[in-house]
């Protein structure tokens, strides 16, 4: 108990996707299926890109890390969400909430920059295939991934520290299905200028920088493809980046839908629906996008299923 008879929050209550009792079991089943598909699909991509000799290229190196990020991002959110569908008391501890926010920020920022790195990789592959192995060398790949995770950790530590530096002493009901910065700050009983500024700066900078890389890469990809004289060559060049282009449009489209809404139409309920998409739906879609449209991945899956024991020994 603090001065002024204010009770400091020690746990939060997550409202969830819906507070309708009749929808809890149906929603549990839907999201359980989504999570199991996420685990199976992304573990499949991780395994194939780790064991198959034909997939030891920069493109599949980045794809493996994207699958790891998607799997981890869903795992930060989904298990607690699924449990809350089945229990009456939908609480999460203060420190558990801080850990969930930090984990979510790490992996969502990592996904943003991994997609940007993959766009650069596709640009180099189409723009200068002869220099591809030199420009996007294993050392460069490791450096890009290391910088991605470093920026993700910096963002997560800074933003989550700012969000939990303010006081929570009134309502503890979060209108969300996981601990996110905006609905948390809406509950604060102290000045939120610093954490709101930190959220704005980091989210804006990360999103803007990665989008610039993606847009410049794809602008140059389109220019390069248009300069190819044969229709067969253009089709082959386009097919090498089609899967990534679809993933980028789906992911950034969801984020832009959430961040570019007019203030008058903005609501936490709308944010929840967008969050469902990029925390639980996109991690299911990415393995499908990259496998169904990718002959190399489909061939690798066939080789793995023909002799899984031999393939696993190559890990």
Swiss-Prot record:
Residues 1-24, 79-97, 165-205, 261-271 are extracellular. PROSITE patterns: G_PROTEIN_RECEP_F1_1, G_PROTEIN_RECEP_F1_2. Glycans are attached at residues 5, 265. Keywords: Disulfide bond, G-protein coupled receptor, Glycoprotein, Membrane, Olfaction, Receptor, Sensory transduction, Transducer, Transmembrane, Transmembrane helix. Its main location: membrane. Pfam families: 7tm_4 (PF13853). One of its GO terms (cellular component) is membrane. Disulfide bonds join 97-179. Residues 46-57, 119-143, 227-239, 293-315 are cytoplasmic. The chain crosses the membrane at residues 25-45, 58-78, 98-118, 144-164, 206-226, 240-260, 272-292. InterPro entries: GPCR_Rhodpsn (IPR000276), GPCR_Rhodpsn_7TM (IPR017452), Olfact_rcpt (IPR000725). It comes from the Eukaryota. GO terms for molecular function: G protein-coupled receptor activity; olfactory receptor activity. It is a multi-pass membrane protein. It is found in: Membrane. Odorant receptor. Belongs to the G-protein coupled receptor 1 family. This is Olfactory receptor 8J2. It comes from Homo sapiens (Human). The gene is OR8J2.
């Amino acid at each position: 108990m603090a001065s002024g008879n204010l009770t400091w929050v020690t746990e939060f209550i997550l409202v969830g996707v819906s507070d309708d009792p009749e929808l809890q079991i149906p929603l549990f089943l839907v999201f359980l299926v989504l999570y199991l598909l996420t685990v199976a699909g992304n573990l499949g991509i991780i395994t194939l890109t780790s064991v198959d000799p034909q997939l030891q290229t920069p493109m599949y190196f980045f794809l493996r890390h994207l699958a790891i990020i998607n799997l981890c991002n869903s795992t930060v959110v989904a298990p607690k969400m699924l449990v809350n569908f089945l229990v009456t008391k939908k609480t999460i501890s203060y420190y558990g909430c801080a850990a969930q926010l930090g984990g979510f920020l790490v992996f969502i920022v990592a996904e943003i920059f991994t997609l940007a790195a993959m766009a650069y990789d596709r640009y180099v592959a189409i723009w200068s295939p002869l220099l591809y192995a030199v420009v996007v060398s294993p050392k460069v790949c490791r450096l890009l991934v290391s910088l991605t995770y470093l920026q993700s950790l910096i963002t997560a530590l800074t933003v989550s520290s700012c969000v939990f530096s303010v006081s929570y002493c009134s309502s503890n009901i979060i209108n969300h299905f996981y601990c996110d910065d905006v609905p948390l700050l809406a509950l604060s009983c102290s000045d939120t200028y610093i954490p709101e500024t930190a959220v704005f700066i980091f989210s804006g900078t990360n999103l803007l920088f990665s989008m610039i890389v993606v847009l410049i890469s794809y602008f140059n990809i389109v220019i390069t493809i248009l300069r190819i004289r044969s229709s067969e060559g253009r089709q082959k060049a386009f097919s090498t980046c089609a899967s990534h282009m679809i993933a980028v449009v789906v992911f950034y489209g969801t984020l832009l839908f959430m961040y570019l809404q007019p203030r008058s139409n903005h609501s936490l309920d709308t944010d929840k629906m967008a969050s469902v998409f990029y925390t639980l739906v996109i991690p299911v879609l990415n393995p499908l996008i990259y496998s169904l449209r990718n002959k190399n991945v489909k061939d690798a899956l066939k080789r793995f299923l023909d002799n899984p024991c031999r393939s696993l020994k190559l890990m």
